[in-house]
């Protein structure tokens, strides 16, 4: 019984060492991962959003490729009316979409999907898909 336990513990230690070495060899860190959305305005899941806001902002974890985006609509009735072209702020992490919103409406926008991957960092890695959903209020605050 004691011999089996010793062999078992050695196997566990060996597997842990392989895992640690492999993880280090791969260089797993934030710098070599694909970009992710770290914030949106309005926030995803927000209710009673002021329909008078004129832009949607999405901020990524790293600098992004200019003039490359995928604001993907699921259904036309849930996508905002666009006013001009998207653009990045000087930080190259925040993309602005000028919009016209309607009161008491649900908006659903994918930022990248499996099929549309044009939100990319400066190294060309596509951002992880992100679902932005929010509802506007009646506009009477």
Can you annotate each of these PLM segments?
Residues 1-4, 19-20, 134:
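A detector of low-complexity, intrinsically disordered, Ser/Thr/Gly/Pro/Ala-rich segments
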Residues 2-12:
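Bacterial N-terminal signal peptides that target proteins for export
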